[in-house]
């Protein structure tokens, strides 16, 4: 049971050997189908994900923390379409026979591992970012620096997972040059655990906690807004003072809202802020107004999540669900072949789950178009400008 056969070892481009699809397919039958399907897939991935990147870069309304990660995810899919899919399609057209150099095969394996891992890690990074924004708002930075650092970390970790392949791990004695696959079973297990089986449960747990916290926050905000509504008297009698506005003084205009907590007021001229009439009763009313403590006001501002961010978050469960549907079969087959060399896995099944995984790279722009009205309108605007 050597490690040089693609039917004995799983790889992120598993089954690239003469036995994977029978004899060389060339441009007849399966080879022609692979060529047409591959060209269409590459075109869809390039067009859709380029549109995502251009739209976010050109439209300020889309430049949100969540969409920074979506651009990073689109970049991983674009690199996959440029660096991996052409060679994958070439191998499929040849019936699974690798006719190029072993060194190019190792580079292909490393890029495939890195980009697949980067996609998963970017989804995990989104879950971490949203979890912090909802549950620890005081520590959340909306300016983008933390998000960019998190994105950089995802790419560095992805490169670290893939680096052993280009550092000689695939150079084993008796290697078959007609087969392009990962030659080390231990590394197959290691990369599968690091790239999929470990981050996916963590990501799902964080998303569950995030949306649970968001529902609680919105319910509390709704209750607080209703409790602050001023009560108007329904009949004759002295006016009822609003506990949130302080004592009632008929000679005074209503107090300026959030004068101490609004950051925009700090830029107004003093003359503008002092133009309301004043009287001794007004001074007394202002002194009697209950002021919330400063840390509490900062906490309310920090916990606020914009409507645009909430819209961006609604599409995330669909993106994660599509990713899991497309990649889970591949990784299950992938690790099964590594842990059970005696188990027979149909080469056509291996090819099918590999294609399914790559199809995911074309799905995300379609998901954004269907489930996010803001992305949809910007896509239309961008296409009109380019056409």
Curated annotation (Swiss-Prot):
<feature type="topological domain" description="Cytoplasmic">
    <location>
        <begin position="209"/>
        <end position="314"/>
    </location>
</feature>
<keyword id="KW-0807">Transducer</keyword>
<feature type="topological domain" description="Cytoplasmic">
    <location>
        <begin position="58"/>
        <end position="67"/>
    </location>
</feature>
<dbReference type="GO" id="GO:0098978">
    <property type="term" value="C:glutamatergic synapse"/>
</dbReference>
<feature type="topological domain" description="Cytoplasmic">
    <location>
        <begin position="129"/>
        <end position="146"/>
    </location>
</feature>
<dbReference type="GO" id="GO:0042053">
    <property type="term" value="P:regulation of dopamine metabolic process"/>
</dbReference>
<dbReference type="GO" id="GO:0006874">
    <property type="term" value="P:intracellular calcium ion homeostasis"/>
</dbReference>
<dbReference type="GO" id="GO:0005886">
    <property type="term" value="C:plasma membrane"/>
</dbReference>
<feature type="glycosylation site" description="N-linked (GlcNAc...) asparagine">
    <location>
        <position position="3"/>
    </location>
</feature>
<protein>
    <recommendedName>
        <fullName>D(4) dopamine receptor</fullName>
    </recommendedName>
</protein>
<keyword id="KW-0449">Lipoprotein</keyword>
<keyword id="KW-0479">Metal-binding</keyword>
<dbReference type="GO" id="GO:0048511">
    <property type="term" value="P:rhythmic process"/>
</dbReference>
<feature type="topological domain" description="Extracellular">
    <location>
        <begin position="338"/>
        <end position="346"/>
    </location>
</feature>
<dbReference type="GO" id="GO:0051379">
    <property type="term" value="F:epinephrine binding"/>
</dbReference>
<feature type="topological domain" description="Extracellular">
    <location>
        <begin position="1"/>
        <end position="34"/>
    </location>
</feature>
<keyword id="KW-1003">Cell membrane</keyword>
<keyword id="KW-0564">Palmitate</keyword>
<keyword id="KW-0472">Membrane</keyword>
<dbReference type="GO" id="GO:0017124">
    <property type="term" value="F:SH3 domain binding"/>
</dbReference>
<dbReference type="InterPro" id="IPR000929">
    <property type="entry name" value="Dopamine_rcpt"/>
</dbReference>
<keyword id="KW-1133">Transmembrane helix</keyword>
<keyword id="KW-0675">Receptor</keyword>
<dbReference type="GO" id="GO:0004930">
    <property type="term" value="F:G protein-coupled receptor activity"/>
</dbReference>
<keyword id="KW-0090">Biological rhythms</keyword>
<dbReference type="GO" id="GO:0051380">
    <property type="term" value="F:norepinephrine binding"/>
</dbReference>
<keyword id="KW-1015">Disulfide bond</keyword>
<dbReference type="GO" id="GO:0001975">
    <property type="term" value="P:response to amphetamine"/>
</dbReference>
<dbReference type="GO" id="GO:0046872">
    <property type="term" value="F:metal ion binding"/>
</dbReference>
<dbReference type="GO" id="GO:0099149">
    <property type="term" value="P:regulation of postsynaptic neurotransmitter receptor internalization"/>
</dbReference>
<keyword id="KW-0297">G-protein coupled receptor</keyword>
<dbReference type="GO" id="GO:0001591">
    <property type="term" value="F:dopamine neurotransmitter receptor activity, coupled via Gi/Go"/>
</dbReference>
<dbReference type="GO" id="GO:0035240">
    <property type="term" value="F:dopamine binding"/>
</dbReference>
<feature type="transmembrane region" description="Helical; Name=3">
    <location>
        <begin position="107"/>
        <end position="128"/>
    </location>
</feature>
<dbReference type="GO" id="GO:0050709">
    <property type="term" value="P:negative regulation of protein secretion"/>
</dbReference>
<dbReference type="GO" id="GO:0050482">
    <property type="term" value="P:arachidonate secretion"/>
</dbReference>
<keyword id="KW-0325">Glycoprotein</keyword>
<keyword id="KW-0915">Sodium</keyword>
<dbReference type="GO" id="GO:0008344">
    <property type="term" value="P:adult locomotory behavior"/>
</dbReference>
<keyword id="KW-0812">Transmembrane</keyword>
<feature type="transmembrane region" description="Helical; Name=7">
    <location>
        <begin position="347"/>
        <end position="369"/>
    </location>
</feature>
<feature type="region of interest" description="Disordered">
    <location>
        <begin position="287"/>
        <end position="306"/>
    </location>
</feature>
